[in-house]
Amino acid sequence: VYAVTTGPLPRIVAVVVTFNRLPLLEKLVARLGEIEGLAEVLVVDNASSDGTGEWLADRPTTGEIPLSGRTLSTNRGGAGGFHDGLAWAIDREADLVWLMDDDGLPDVDCLDRLLLETDNLDFWGPLVVDEADPDRLVFPIRLPGGTRVVHAVGDVRRAASHDRIDGIVIPFNGVLVTKELVDRIGLPREEFFIWGDDHEYRLRAEEAGARVATVVTATVRHPSVGNLGTPMMFGRTTYNDSPSDLKHYCMARNNLVNLRDYRGPLHALAFVVKTAWFYTFTRPSLSRLRLSVGAMRAGIAGDFDGHRRFLS
């Protein structure tokens, strides 16, 4: 626990994971150079082919803050990037690690506002708002203790107590994690590649008794990701259907593993039934049904290599 007003300030290291989005990375790195309180910025480049590695090699600082880049030999997805980046930050003697993707842009006061809520938290982050419509959340929040899902920034701020909502965090979009928590629960599951690694890390943290929260006065701006769910079962629920075979394969595999490990066999079975219903009735597709079955079998068997066939 770090008191911001008394005692030594924590050593805060920002970790950015990037893949082939150099214009967005340039903007984000410039913004991080304007934020006081950062000791260092580390960028993990997932073997980008757009000149990211060369760009990083030419930049030892952003503003007054030391900047280091590390280009991985192969693209290991967000999961591999955050696994390596978090380990790197801890190796660089970080007390707090600020984790983010390359497509978010924290407000200049975002870190300050997060640090006002340092006491008694292990894993906490900002609201992630639509850059084109800052009154809307990019990732809707299900409020604790009920089924209500909120999409509007005003609604989530009204639901907050003392500027925060305990029990909710949206990793890895500008979240802070303490060294103590990393020492306790380890690193993100790199084998997930993409999809669900952030959710799994939050579930693992909660299972270990971590105190998580969203600070509603802190903001990261992020491009809209569109509608995250397609209505199904006569509008009773939604299904996360991606046009990308890679994303769908990882979602089906990793989500089943997360449900089995953290929610139990009934929740896992419900997801299997939901997937079968969606690709049989809602959006019929035999090929997508087969892909889902293969992904789920792989997850149950602990085989996390199947997604590689979708990588060019």
Task: Report the location of each language-model feature.
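A conserved acidic beta->alpha catalytic loop
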Residues: D45-E54, T74, G104-L105
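Non-catalytic, C-terminal membrane-associated alpha-helical segments of glycosyltransferases
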Residues: R260-S312
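Short, acidic, metal-binding catalytic loop of nucleotide-sugar glycosyltransferases
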Residues: A30-A39
